């Protein structure tokens, strides 16, 4: 396979070239204008950030992206799917409110904001890919219906995947709530009876008649009928239907790669990642710990696998910040250049396994050429 081209822009600015200008120049040089954008519904997949977390990509970048896409005739919209865990982004109403609090709205972002899997995370399409782990990933409908996919990725650590980049944003981020259950879980859901109030919503909406209320009006799952679709987890507002067992990091990354294939199947796509505010954990937390390395730059590519590998390599090569962060406290007199910082922080994770699987199933290549502009 030919080397993928990954384009890199540093963060140095001048009075005639600010960071937004540099991002636009990077995108154009990397070939975003070659996409069939005219009259296309173009999904800009971005993480709006859990309220309290300040490491997410600023809405200014999203607005510049939307305006650039519109200049090519596209109909862009910002989008994300609801979360599996209970929080401020587990349903569309709270999710949109959270996005607005963090600066993402039609005025500031210069385009509409759409929660792709609907009000309660149950609006999705199954995309058949014949995957080894996920035969038919459940993708949020607004993303499945989009003509073109653009991912804007904050590159940072992740406590289960090792790091979060393009594949994490695509594979996990575009999954419906039930899809996220398939990604995370190694078994069927269970009922935390102490939280169940007997509201009956899971019983009414189980497509497989696998749930009933017992004599104590607590939900019970018939595992001979349960297919592990996750609808009960998506619908329960009381943390009563929950994930039973979490999958390993390696299998999670395999599944993320396969979900990414489903998201991008038969669609033109393009990706940009920001190595800024590289926090040790994901933006789903309501806080962000201190950055572990200096801000490095922005990278863009048509190949999400090459993009993730290039970002990982740059972080590995970078020195650790000697400030009060999780790595500096343990390695006070070391610069850690050449060290796998994500594995040092999360030793039970294996991010490289996901990239290898993504390469194996044809999503992209880890063999890249870094082009500095």
What are these regions (language model features)?
Residues 2-53, 57-61, 67, 72-80, ...:
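Extended, low-polarity segments enriched in aliphatic/aromatic residues
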């Amino acid at each position: 396979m030919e080397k993928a081209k990954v384009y890199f822009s540093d963060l140095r600015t001048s009075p005639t070239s600010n960071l937004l200008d540099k991002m636009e120049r990077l995108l154009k040089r990397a070939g975003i204008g070659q996409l069939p954008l005219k009259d296309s519904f173009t999904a800009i997949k971005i993480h709006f950030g859990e309220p309290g977390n300040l490491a997410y990509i600023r809405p200014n970048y999203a607005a510049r992206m939307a305006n650039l896409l519109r200049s090519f005739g596209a109909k862009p919209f910002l989008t994300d799917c609801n979360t599996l865990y209970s929080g401020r982004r587990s349903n569309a109403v709270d999710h949109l409110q959270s996005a607005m609090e963090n600066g993402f709205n039609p005025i500031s972002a210069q385009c509409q904001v759409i929660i792709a899997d609907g009000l309660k995370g149950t609006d999705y399409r199954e995309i058949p890919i014949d995957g080894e782990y996920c035969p038919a990933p459940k993708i949020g409908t607004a993303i499945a219906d989009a003509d073109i996919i653009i991912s804007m990725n904050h590159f940072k650590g992740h406590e289960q995947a090792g790091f979060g980049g393009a594949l994490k944003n695509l594979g996990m981020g575009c999954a419906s709530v039930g899809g996220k259950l398939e990604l995370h879980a190694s078994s069927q859901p269970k009922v935390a009876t102490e939280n169940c109030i007997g509201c009956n919503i899971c019983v009414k909406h189980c497509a497989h008649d696998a749930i009933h209320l017992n004599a104590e009006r607590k939900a019970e799952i018939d595992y001979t009928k349960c297919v592990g679709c996750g609808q009960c987890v998506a619908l329960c507002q009381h943390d009563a239907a929950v994930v039973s067992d979490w999958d390993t990091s390696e299998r999670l990354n395999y599944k993320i790669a396969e979900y990414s294939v489903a998201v991008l199947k038969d669609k033109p796509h393009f990706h940009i990642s920001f190595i800024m505010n590289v926090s040790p954990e994901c933006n789903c937390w309501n806080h962000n710990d201190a950055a572990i390395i200096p801000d490095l730059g922005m990278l863009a590519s048509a190949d999400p696998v090459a993009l993730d590998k290039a970002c990982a390599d740059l972080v590995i090569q970078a020195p650790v910040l000697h400030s009060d962060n999780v790595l500096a406290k343990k390695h006070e007199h070391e610069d850690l250049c050449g060290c796998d910082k994500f594995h040092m922080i999360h030793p039970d994770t294996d991010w490289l396994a996901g990239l290898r699987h993504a390469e194996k199933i044809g999503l992209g290549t880890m063999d890249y050429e870094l082009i500095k502009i």
